[in-house]
């Protein structure tokens, strides 16, 4: 069962590294930045709490 889990993980990681189809090539820079967007929300939470003095 553990082997199957590892096999699926490798399949997922190889799919993430696939290039976009040619029709969507213009969105490639946006797609490169998209995984970072949740980090901005995480940092925004700290800025928000700092502005209200970490109540």
UniProtKB/Swiss-Prot annotation:
The keyword Thylakoid applies. The keyword Metal-binding does not apply. It comes from the Eukaryota. InterPro entries: PSII_PsbK, PSII_PsbK_sf. Its main location: plastid. PSII is composed of 1 copy each of membrane proteins PsbA, PsbB, PsbC, PsbD, PsbE, PsbF, PsbH, PsbI, PsbJ, PsbK, PsbL, PsbM, PsbT, PsbX, PsbY, PsbZ, Psb30/Ycf12, at least 3 peripheral proteins of the oxygen-evolving complex and a large number of cofactors. It forms dimeric complexes. PANTHER family: PHOTOSYSTEM II REACTION CENTER PROTEIN K, PTHR35325. This is Photosystem II reaction center protein K. The gene is psbK.
